[in-house]
Amino acid sequence: MALRRGPGLYPFLALCVLGAGYLLASRLGYLDRLQARFFPAAKQAVRLSPGDFPAGVAAPVADLASVPLRPTLIGFTARGSAAALLLATGGASSLDNPVAPAGAAQGLLKTAYAMDARAVVFATDEELRKALAVGAEHGGVDMAAISVDRLAAWLPSLRDAAPRTVMLVGRSRGQEALAAVGVPDLASLRGKRLGVYPSGASYYFSLWVLSRAGLRMTDVSWVELPSTLDAGRALREGRADAVAGLWGDVELAARDRGGAVLATTADAPHLVATVLVARGDYAARYPDAVRRVIRGLLDAGASVQKEPGPAARLLGEVAPYLGDPTEAIRSAPPATLADNRAFFGLSGEAPVTYDELFQSASALYQKIRRTAVTPPAEDTRDLGALKYVSEARGP
């Protein structure tokens, strides 16, 4: 039986020719030219930003300057471990009033390391994030003391700043607390209103508390607070049944209403760790300044541990809401060189390392859709300066 060509052969051949023509035109770039000529709006607009390039591309070609000619601005939110920073800089200033504090000339960084540095206090973590994002050249800061979980949550929005962790400042050992009124235990938080500032370390702590109690995020009604410092007020005013915030604030509020503190970071002393991060452009341009800051903070931390009085006075002036400043320092003491070595895996052992803490916080915030995908922990730290100081000081 002879084969006969059906009516579909010619359309099939035509489709083959069109397909081959499309592939050829695509390879030769004709399609892109036609799109650019007749449909220019359809071409994707690509936004370039400083984060697309290495942070140090604008550093001087010749010898790098030791320190900047202007003051180095280090941002922080008040907590016990900030006592070392205050002692190193002689006090605190603000972006609204950048005048050097009265004791700046007596700060350890000035007297021991000939470096002009200022500690800039912020009322909220979100304000600190914005200041780090823009940098000191544009009304922000060069460095910032922030918790590791905050860095994990903020890193996508700080891409252009290219922040790098350079040292451990301290850990919370009771500074964060969850207090409640009419709630006898953690399991009884189910169905209650939980007030917390979502951009602070207290939020991360509250998530850990829920996991410890076997509760889901949907088991409580979240009340978003404008700042960590609003936690005590929210509990007093009855806007929340429980709040997470600073011990000195929430413990007093709970006691005033017959409530109690249900949990603190003393139950998880390796959960909230404050680290010093430097903008990538600053660290690349002034590597010696980073080393001097690390030395100064370690020296100041040692002085605080030996005699907390002077640092406690400075802390009390800056943050009276922390309560007794000496107790605030005890619940979040400045980190030592040994703490830094263990935390970053340089020597010794730590129950939780920087990499573990960053990766777990990053995974958690992605899980609850609080942040985008972040780079691995090793890409967020620069330990060159810390290693230099560590080797110089010996075992």
State the predicted function of each range.
Residues D63, V183-A187, T218-D219, A284, ...:
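Proline/Glycine/Serine-rich low-complexity intrinsically disordered segments
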Residues C16-L28:
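Hydrophobic alpha-helical membrane-insertion segments, chiefly the h-region
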Residues Y286-T371:
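Secondary-structure end/capping motifs
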Residues M1-V17:
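N-terminal Sec-pathway targeting helices
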Residues L31-T218, W222-L225, D241-W247, L262-T264, ...:
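Short, glycine-/small- and polar/acidic-enriched structural segments
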Residues S26, T111, S211, R255, ...:
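Short polybasic/polar patches that bind polyanions
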Residues D149-R150, V223, L229-G323:
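Pocket-lining segment of extracytoplasmic ligand-binding domains
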